[in-house]
Amino acid sequence: MSLASTLPRASFETLLQHTNFMDGIKFVFFAFVVYSCFTIAVGWVVYEWKRKAHGCGKIPRYPHRDPFFGFDIVFGMAKSLRNDYFLVWLNKVHENLPKTFLVNFVGTRFIYTIEPENMKSMSAINWQDFAVGPMRRNNKATAPFADKGVNTVDGHEWEFSRFLIKPFFKRETFTDTSRLTLHVDRVLEQLPADGETVNIQPLIQRWFLDVTTASLFGESIESLVYPERAPICWAMVDVLRGLRLRLQWYKYLWLFRHQAWLDAVEVVHRYLNAHIDRTYKELDEYKRQGKNPEAADRNDLLWYMASNLQDKEALRSQICLIFVPNNDTTSIFISHILWNLARHPGIYEKCRQEVLALGDAELSFSVLRNMKYLNAVLNETHRLFPNGVTQVRKCIRDTTLPVGGGPDGKQPIFVRKGDVVQVNKNVIHRDHDIWGPDAEDFRPERWENLRPYWNFVPFGGGPRRCPAQMLVTAEASYFLARLMRVYKRIEARDPNPYVGVMRVGPSNKTGVHIALFKE
């Protein structure tokens, strides 16, 4: 007797349907596996053919514990970001490996490199073969904080964004140190008496917030005078830290869900909306009266941008991607300088003597620019604590990089469309082959006869080089020179080692606890 004859008809049909369903699932799974294997095989054959056609060597591979998906490196990165040891983790990834190697990031080919020549090629020679948009905007990594801006787009859209922000970085702006005087006066007034411990980092952040808002919006927020206005500064810190996590996750940012980050974004948006609404209202009044906006008393960046962009959300996006990252750059840079000087009193004294040798001379841009040892201190800080730890680009057409292939790593490598190249600048800046056995040491004297090129790239290079370098240098130099005219020595009051918390770049987790002495 058959099984079918012993079962009720309904039960038999149910079993039959279930069997057909399971067979279908098996068939679909089998077809998927076959298709995947076929696609991978064809892709590998095509890649190898192109690699050989370009005369390129094989790229060494990272020794994954999970070679299929690369979850080991994904989870390692996530853990390091969550527990604030990303810089340590990144250095360990490069330990005992060639200077260029291939990483599997959940199916996406990442090429990690610390070769200056590859940085040069990606940033300057073949820069149009690479793009930032797929890494930042196309996958909504910066949304809802911002959309289009100089840091997130390519091509003509990037050229337009660059046009919008150009006045902020013009020579007349960064050479005018008088715009800093009042705000530095206020910082010096708020520093405690001789020998009292102070975490100077939040104070510097408020100082730079005051400086930046004056230049961007035509009026300073004056958070040093009105501390209750400072929360916008801390909201920007939260936004930047969230952005760093989202950018690191690449196309898997759906794993990032933090309501606190969205709340911080809302705080920043409300603040900017008020300035944008005021500016558009003033522009409309100018136009109603038949006046030329270029002849207005206002010469701040927002006025210029609003005159050339009439879409409120688009304007807010553009200003977000300048205002928030820029506010973190100089303040954290100065914090890093003071963190190091507090641990090297001899360097502080040598730098101070150079400042005192100026007498009562005005601290103009030209004067500060010619202070060799002060600038060496700035460069050494940039080297050990670059604001941009990595430079990441997605390849948008098949191309090559000059080195990294073959057994000796000297052959060019083939980079196919869709590959992601990550130059780890923090590792380059500490490479013993470039900087010597004391590469980890803070030693400004190394800059006395040093003329670096692509092995020192704190602001990137090529057409997309960050235009803020001279602005940051002028602001940091002026602040430090004013401080050194007042305080004879500096002392560290935090014995803990540096722990880098990632935002745009790293900042010390515990701040900068120091004591300053006038005598």
UniProtKB/Swiss-Prot annotation:
Q: Specify one Pfam family.
A: p450
Cofactors that this protein relies on: heme
What coarse category fits the chief subcellular location reported for this protein?
membrane
This chain belongs to which protein, by name? Answer: Cytochrome P450 monooxygenase apdE
Query: Where can this protein be found?
Result: Membrane
Its placement in the membrane is given as:
Single-pass membrane protein
Q: Which domain of life is it from?
A: Eukaryota
CDD domains of this UniProt entry? CYP52 (cd11063)
What pathway is this protein said to act in by its record? Secondary metabolite biosynthesis
Q: Where does the record say carbohydrate is attached?
A: N327, N379, N508
Provide a Gene Ontology MF annotation, just one. Answer: monooxygenase activity
- Tell me, in a sentence or two, what this protein's role is: Cytochrome P450 monooxygenase; part of the gene cluster that mediates the biosynthesis of aspyridones. The polyketide-amino acid backbone preaspyridone A is first assembled by the PKS-NRPS hybrid apdA. The assembly of preaspyridone A is initiated by loading of malonyl-CoA onto apdA, followed by decarboxylation to yield the acetyl starter unit. The growing polyketide chain then elongates into a tetraketide. The adpA PKS module catalyzes three Claisen condensations, as well as beta-keto processing and methylation.
A Gene Ontology cellular component where this protein is annotated is: membrane
Gene for this chain:
apdE
